[in-house]
């Protein structure tokens, strides 16, 4: 891992969300003095920011936990940067009360199949474009969508409607695109 930071065009490294904490710590210890290292998982920031000086979050499903009116994740990160851990913790627990959303709502990691479709759905519910992911992908079940929508509502986020908009994408839906009706 240290050799990555020797490459002249490498300035940062994102430790994939959901990986082991040991990998996160090792990445900061081996590369953190030479390149910017990021773990995108908010619960890890409580030690990666104060101990290792993490400066950025990398990509993650933050959109399903905040809105422009209430940027919870941004506030957590900013408070941790300022050393205001108690304030960050209050926001974290407020956000965690309803239970996890997106991919964490029904952890597909246990299935051995990793798909971003639940995260895409949660993003769409919070105002994102939606649209499905490339094939092959897993199916998004009604109970998963119901759980994501319930979590959104508990956070004070009104999920988007109609469902069809998710599948074609918000932008395409606004242009008049609709799902094709397939007959058996």
Functional labels for PLM-detected ranges:
Residues 1-111:
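Catalytic alpha/beta core domains of metabolic enzymes, predominantly
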Residues 60-184:
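C-terminal alpha-helical cap/extension of soluble enzyme domains
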């Amino acid at each position: 891992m240290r050799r990555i930071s020797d490459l002249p065009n490498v300035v940062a490294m994102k430790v994939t969300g959901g990986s082991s904490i040991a990998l996160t710590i090792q990445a900061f210890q081996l590369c953190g003095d030479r390149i910017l290292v990021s773990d995108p998982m908010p619960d890890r920031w409580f030690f990666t920011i104060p101990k290792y000086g993490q400066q950025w979050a990398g990509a993650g499903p933050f959109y399903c936990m905040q809105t422009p009116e209430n940027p919870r994740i941004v506030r957590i990160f900013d408070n941790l940067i300022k050393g205001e851990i108690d304030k960050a913790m209050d926001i974290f627990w407020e956000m965690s009360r309803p239970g996890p959303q997106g991919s964490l709502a029904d952890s597909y990691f246990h299935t051995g199949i990793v798909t971003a479709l639940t995260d895409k759905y949660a993003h769409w519910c919070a105002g994102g474009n939606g649209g499905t992911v490339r094939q092959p992908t897993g199916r998004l079940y009604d109970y998963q969508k119901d759980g994501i929508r319930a979590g959104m509502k508990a956070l004070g986020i009104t999920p988007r409607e109609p469902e069809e908009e998710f599948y074609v994408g918000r932008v395409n839906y606004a242009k008049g695109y609709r799902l094709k009706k397939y007959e058996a």
